[in-house]
Amino acid sequence: IEHLKGTTEHYAYALTELHQQITPDPSKAVVTPLKTDAILALATSTMEHYSLRPSKIHGKAKATLFPTILSYMGFGGYLNPFTHEAQVNTLQPKLRIITTACHEIAHQWGIAAEDEANYFSIKATTVSDIVLVSYAGHLLAFQNLVNALYRTDADQAKAVMEKLPEGILENIREVRAFWEKYQNPFEEVFERSYDQYLKANQQQAGIKSYSLVVDLLVDDYINR
C-alpha cells in the first residue's frame, strides 16, 4: 500500500503543478476552448509522436455517431471491429475526450488489453509538451490511483484529496457528474455483456482489466 500511496501522491503533486501552469486561480477548473474536432486531432498527434508507437502503424480518432447511446451504456469509446476506427464519445468532458481518444488509438495499434491501452494513453499524454494534454493524462492516472487507494485505505486517499486545489477537484467532479447523469437500469446489463466479450477475447479479468493500469503505474513509480 505504501507504493500505491507514493504513486498517488506523485501524480497529485504533478497534477497540481500543471494546474498552476494553466490557471493562476487554484479554485478554477481547467477548461479548454478547443472544439471537439481539434481535441481529437490533438489526441491523434499526441499518439503519433509517442515514442512507443509501433513503426508503420498509425491511428486516428473520430467522433462516434451515437454518443448518447454510448453514454447510457457507460462507454467512453470503442474500436469499431469492422472499420477498425477509433470511435470516441464526444459528450464526455473534453479532458476525458483526449485520453479516451488516445486509449482507442492504442487499440488501433494492436494493443488489445484494456489496462495496456489505458497505460499507453496515460504515458503518451503525461509526457506531452502540451500542458493541457499532460494535465488530462495526469488527471486520468490520478483518478485511477486514488480510487484504488480508497479501496485499500480510505483515510489515506482522503488525505491526498484534501491537499488538491479546488480546481482539480472540480475537474474530477465534472467527470463523475457526467457519468452519473447517464446511469440507468440497463447499464449493468451492458457492463456484464462487455465483461463476457472481454473474457472471450483473452482478457481474463474482463471489465476489471481497466483498473489493472494501476499496477502498471505503480511499477513505473517504483522503477523510475
Locations of regions flagged by a protein language model:
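Pan-zinc metallopeptidase signature
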Residues: 167-224
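Sec/Tat-exported extracytoplasmic proteins
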Residues: 15, 19-26, 46-50, 90, ...
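Auxiliary, metal-adjacent structural segments of Zn-dependent hydrolase domains
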Residues: 19-95
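Alpha-helical transmembrane signal-anchor/signal-peptide segments
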Residues: 1-7
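Active-site/pore-lining binding-face segments in mid-to-C-terminal subdomains
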Residues: 119-121, 126-170
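Short conserved active-site loop signatures built around small residues
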Residues: 12
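Active-site recognition of the HExxH zinc-binding catalytic motif
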Residues: 99-118, 122-123
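Solvent-exposed, acidic/flexible segments
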Residues: 36, 90-98, 110-114, 132-135, ...
